[in-house]
Amino acid sequence: MESSLFSPSSSSYSSLFTAKPTRLLSPKPKFTFSIRSSIEKPKPKLETNSSKSQSWVSPDWLTTLTRTLSSGKNDESGIPIANAKLDDVADLLGGALFLPLYKWMNEYGPIYRLAAGPRNFVIVSDPAIAKHVLRNYPKYAKGLVAEVSEFLFGSGFAIAEGPLWTARRRAVVPSLHRRYLSVIVERVFCKCAERLVEKLQPYAEDGSAVNMEAKFSQMTLDVIGLSLFNYNFDSLTTDSPVIEAVYTALKEAELRSTDLLPYWKIDALCKIVPRQVKAEKAVTLIRETVEDLIAKCKEIVEREGERINDEEYVNDADPSILRFLLASREEVSSVQLRDDLLSMLVAGHETTGSVLTWTLYLLSKNSSALRKAQEEVDRVLEGRNPAFEDIKELKYITRCINESMRLYPHPPVLIRRAQVPDILPGNYKVNTGQDIMISVYNIHRSSEVWEKAEEFLPERFDIDGAIPNETNTDFKFIPFSGGPRKCVGDQFALMEAIVALAVFLQRLNVELVPDQTISMTTGATIHTTNGLYMKVSQR
């Protein structure tokens, strides 16, 4: 997915802010969501534990410090400064950060500043400004995203810059060709989706509730392991140290993005702070596992004298991306290859799992849409598994997924850092080093951009038209980002979601467990705080 992976939405410098008059849009009415904000008064949940990060800094202390540091600061950008309230701090520090960003968009307009002591962020909720920033690489680099995820990605292309990024992207993109996707649909996407349905049978038989967010996360981890390096995590069936390490590393990246103080930049502290010691052990295990897979695959490629002989080369025994990259005989170190694969592992796993979670949630709340989706599956597939050529015929399911990604984009924000002074559309000035937070969530939910923006309406996208993307919507729809650093795996991710949802809906009915409060929190994607519990039954 888009390589701004780990909660670019929440930064290590989030804080409270002082207000200035604005000359932008007047406040708009708040949208009504079926999901409750994590800043609402909590109600009983199915689980008592919350995944929401807790800061050791109290909101009152943070407010006082920030206002003291920010007061009197010169600002010639022409960008208004948002004024946060204490209730917003919980979401700024480890919660659903995109919710207060959305609230302030309605108050201050499509661009505003969050001042955080010596550092501040420009929040962008306007498609034209987003287009300008995303298309103008290398004027705008990854910045904060690279800082919080380098411990895991190393020099992987997800966070690489300059010539290294150009070289690695050129090496990776050819591996995602049409023939590869057609093979993976049958051998991996369908098989893993069938395995998921199989694992849901006990729940269908006894009527007990199942956390579908967790199940989709497990399934997509299995998919990405097989697709990338022909490695079966088998996380739907078993637990293993490698699986635990993957989730530990993902959690650490999310926590780093919300830590007020980036203490993990100090090597000495990383050796004694328990959280950092655990994260380092996890990353070491993941890297050793991937390095071992690379070494074994390289040995096979060398022994067989394998070499790519056409643009859509696929090894029949092992169609993985790793096999393609090694057979290309490109001069690249095992460490660089490892970092590139880890970039794709994290991006491909986190995003698709969240897309499926929220799509199923939305369908469960809309019986008409759910019925249409199942009718399409029955008509197109006629009881069999989807093949590559069937995907283009699953038009309504595709639009349901598109609409889900509009309402719940992954990631909900993208971060860039200005490398040179620039003037944004609207004549707003930014200086070198300015961090810019593009709120995909705001753009996708803005009533200035979309009619009935808060409603789940798959039909808003022409079912017989082109699949919506940043180009044909003029950056109004950017779930995979846009510009030169757009997600390289957008087709892979969309096809995986279509196949998984089709297989699921073909075999099972689904019902949302009533009376559960589904709160949101920010990570690499939009998570629930306590899971998404549903009941499934055989069709």
Swiss-Prot record:
<dbReference type="InterPro" id="IPR001128">
    <property type="entry name" value="Cyt_P450"/>
</dbReference>
<dbReference type="GO" id="GO:0005506">
    <property type="term" value="F:iron ion binding"/>
</dbReference>
<keyword id="KW-0560">Oxidoreductase</keyword>
<dbReference type="InterPro" id="IPR017972">
    <property type="entry name" value="Cyt_P450_CS"/>
</dbReference>
<dbReference type="InterPro" id="IPR036396">
    <property type="entry name" value="Cyt_P450_sf"/>
</dbReference>
<comment type="similarity">
    <text>Belongs to the cytochrome P450 family.</text>
</comment>
<keyword id="KW-0150">Chloroplast</keyword>
<keyword id="KW-0503">Monooxygenase</keyword>
<keyword id="KW-0809">Transit peptide</keyword>
<dbReference type="GO" id="GO:0072374">
    <property type="term" value="F:carotene epsilon hydroxylase activity"/>
</dbReference>
<keyword id="KW-0349">Heme</keyword>
<dbReference type="Pfam" id="PF00067">
    <property type="entry name" value="p450"/>
</dbReference>
<dbReference type="GO" id="GO:0009941">
    <property type="term" value="C:chloroplast envelope"/>
</dbReference>
<dbReference type="InterPro" id="IPR050196">
    <property type="entry name" value="Cytochrome_P450_Monoox"/>
</dbReference>
<keyword id="KW-0408">Iron</keyword>
<feature type="binding site" description="axial binding residue">
    <location>
        <position position="487"/>
    </location>
    <ligand>
        <name>heme</name>
    </ligand>
</feature>
<comment type="function">
    <text>Heme-containing cytochrome P450 involved in the biosynthesis of xanthophylls. Specific for epsilon- and beta-ring hydroxylation of alpha-carotene. Has only a low activity toward the beta-rings of beta-carotene. The preferred substrate in planta is not alpha-carotene but the epsilon-ring of zeinoxanthin. Possesses a major beta-carotene hydroxylase activity in planta when depleted in its preferred substrate alpha-carotene.</text>
</comment>
<keyword id="KW-0934">Plastid</keyword>
<feature type="transit peptide" description="Chloroplast">
    <location>
        <begin position="1"/>
        <end position="36"/>
    </location>
</feature>
<keyword id="KW-0125">Carotenoid biosynthesis</keyword>
<keyword id="KW-0479">Metal-binding</keyword>
<dbReference type="InterPro" id="IPR002401">
    <property type="entry name" value="Cyt_P450_E_grp-I"/>
</dbReference>
<dbReference type="GO" id="GO:0016117">
    <property type="term" value="P:carotenoid biosynthetic process"/>
</dbReference>
<dbReference type="GO" id="GO:0009507">
    <property type="term" value="C:chloroplast"/>
</dbReference>
<protein>
    <recommendedName>
        <fullName>Carotene epsilon-monooxygenase, chloroplastic</fullName>
        <ecNumber>1.14.14.158</ecNumber>
    </recommendedName>
</protein>
<dbReference type="GO" id="GO:0020037">
    <property type="term" value="F:heme binding"/>
</dbReference>
